[in-house]
Each structure stands twice: as C-alpha cells, then as structure tokens.
C-alpha cells in the first residue's frame, strides 16, 4: 500500500458537508482529522484540541459525557487499527500514532485484549448529543480512501434512544 506521507490530502469539505445531518470526517492513517463536517464537529466536542480521534476517545475530557458505550466503541477502534496495521504495516502515520498511544493505559489494555472481529465495518455507537440533550444511535463505519491509507469515517444516525 502507498503511504499518504507524500500525497496531497484532497479537499473533501464540500462532500463531507453534504452528508449532514450525519457526522463524517476524513482522517489520516493516524486518525488525525483532516476535514470534518459541521455535525461531526458538533457531536464530538473537544476533538479540535486533541491530536487525533484516538487520543480524544481515550483521554478527551468530554469523551465520557459524549460516548456512552465506551467499551464497545473502544473495541471497534482497536479492531480498525489492527486491520489497518495488517493492511499497511509500514505506514509512518499509523506506526507513529500507535507509538504515541502506547503509554495510555486504557488504550494499551484494550490493544492487548482485543482481536479483530469477523466484520469490524460497522458498529453502533451510543452518543449523547450535548446540544440537544438527547442520546443518538449512530452506526459508525470506516472506508479506506482508495489505495492510500487515509480513511473516511461516517456515522449514520439511526435514531434516538431514551436518555
């Protein structure tokens, strides 16, 4: 697989924005958010201050208030990381983020316990919408961007559940 280190990241802002009201983002192999639509930024508050989505998920101050099924979403993230590592073991962005995340106890514990499920493609997340005081069921899905190691993360809002 080709690393994206030397490739220019395409401007997908308009495409991502057209996916509203569903949260969507374009990520590097190291899960750094390069572009995100307004719904993604609104739901995943505090993400802009984190170096990447993984860091936000494991140590973000607001994450426990937003991601209500943290264990399940953590398993999903780890599964995707392991799958991407199997597909692109030499990707510098991916190996860099794994090295940066390894000192984080929760991340390391989940990394050591997790195995890749039969289909890590979609996993429902239960997410609190802090702006509207509601709880959303979001099917999270990741696609690799062509032959690069970049990713598109799309959450399809399936409905609300009782808070």
What are these regions (language model features)?
Residues 1-11:
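Short, charged amphipathic alpha-helical "coupling" segments at sensory-output junctions
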Residues 7-8, 37, 106-108, 133-139:
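Short amphipathic alpha-helical surface micro-motifs
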Residues 14-16, 20-22, 27-120, 128, 156-160:
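PAS-family sensory domains
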Residues 115-163:
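Low-complexity, glycine/alanine/valine/leucine- and proline-rich hydrophobic stretches
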